Amino acid sequence: MTDYARYIDHTLLAANATEQQIIALCDEAVAHRFYAVCVNSGYVPLVAEKLKGTDVQVCSVIGFPLGAGLTASKAFEAKAAIDAGAQEIDMVINVGWLKSGKIAAVQADIQAVREVCAAIPLKVILETCLLDDEQIVLVCEMCRQLDVAFVKTSTGFSTGGAREEHVRLMRNTVGSEMGVKASGAVRDRQTAQRMIEAGATRIGTSSGVAIVSGEAAAAGNY
């Protein structure tokens, strides 16, 4: 039987997320033994304090949700988040650079954050809904060469979330050693199971409680 809890990065990334909601997120993660809590970097100190002494990891997004900032700012934010207690980093690639053919710049962007995250797992968000298969494969191969821990489908803030065919393509490209995180629109146990069967080893969702309980998630959840 699948232990769904250990796949879940319990996530709250909304701009209007309150401290009380973040605290509740942490409490749910501890109660259900989720793998991690994933938040914006400004909430990392609070989450690190709430999760101290537990097995739940602290995950921060970087360059979120557009990925279009300066590379130096992403590296700075990642270091600041780690210093504040982040144990995993999820960064967004610069999709515009990729679609402009600036492949070396995309690689340098990832590498700069990877160097900051030398001691902790880095997950690279591709925003697959904006890419074609060739671009997905290109970034996955790039991440494998840079020894990135995970490739991740989506921010959940663009035109679409995780799709089985993209998860399967990512898994087939990176092989069995790297992680694949499916995120965005994974709101129930059936969808989570399909993503896992397609090759996902982590699920980013705000519907973790619904997934582990087998219940329906609230409308509009990440």
Curated annotation (Swiss-Prot):
It catalyses: 2-deoxy-D-ribose 5-phosphate = D-glyceraldehyde 3-phosphate + acetaldehyde. InterPro entries: Aldolase_TIM (IPR013785), DeoC (IPR011343), DeoC/FbaB/LacD_aldolase (IPR002915), DeoC_typeI (IPR028581). One of its GO terms (cellular component) is cytoplasm. GO terms for molecular function: deoxyribose-phosphate aldolase activity. Pathway: Carbohydrate degradation; 2-deoxy-D-ribose 1-phosphate degradation; D-glyceraldehyde 3-phosphate and acetaldehyde from 2-deoxy-alpha-D-ribose 1-phosphate: step 2/2. Catalyzes a reversible aldol reaction between acetaldehyde and D-glyceraldehyde 3-phosphate to generate 2-deoxy-D-ribose 5-phosphate. This is Deoxyribose-phosphate aldolase. The gene is deoC.
